Amino acid sequence: MNILVTGGAGYIGSVLVEILLRNNFNVTVLDSFLYKQKSLDKLNNDPCLKIIKGDVRDEKIIKDLVPKCDIVIPLAALVGAPLCETRPQEAKEVNLDSISLLKSKLTKNQRVILPVSNSGYGIGKPGEFCTEESPLNPISLYGRTKVKSESIIMERDNSVSFRLATDRKSVV
């Protein structure tokens, strides 16, 4: 099984790539290496790993990579509200437009697994945990791009979205 992971050198991506390789998947990582990450260095010699330095907004790269995979896991993003607010156009292009581009190159048999940040939930009700059924009320550009990307991907069959939420207890 061939899997394309965009943003595969990022925090979640690098952990996921290692797990996929351990389970004998062929993995292609597309990452811009914006922060010069070294997270995949220890996996460089794995014959099942192919690393492409490139931009998820580059139609030529996407057109070349997508037909070679069975599953796409789009993790590439400008992450976090502060970064997205200071670079709104780039946030829209990377977090949202690249998802539309990716979707346009998929066949009906290819699957997509899309995790969505807890930023999609916005501010929840005090004392209540978010669930898959909780309303999505993003309060930041980052959250809005992630929610919209989910709706774009979920318009097609063979797609799964995982809404990720965290619960932090404060010491104070």
Role assignments for model-derived ranges:
Residues 1-71, 80:
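N-terminal Rossmann/SDR dinucleotide-binding element
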Residues 6, 30, 72-76, 112-118, ...:
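SDR active-site strand-loop-helix element
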Residues 36-37, 79-83, 121-123, 168:
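Short beta->alpha connector loops of Rossmann-like oxidoreductase domains
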Residues 58, 90, 97-101, 111, ...:
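Conserved cofactor-binding/catalytic machinery of classical short-chain dehydrogenase/reductase
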Residues 74, 100-141:
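Conserved Rossmann-fold NAD(P)-dependent oxidoreductase catalytic core, especially the SDR/UDP-sugar
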Residues 81-98, 130-137:
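Short alpha-helical oligomerization interface
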Residues 112, 116-117, 150-172:
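Conserved beta-loop-beta element that borders a ligand/cofactor-binding pocket
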Residues 123-126, 137-160:
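Active-site Tyr-X1-5-Lys
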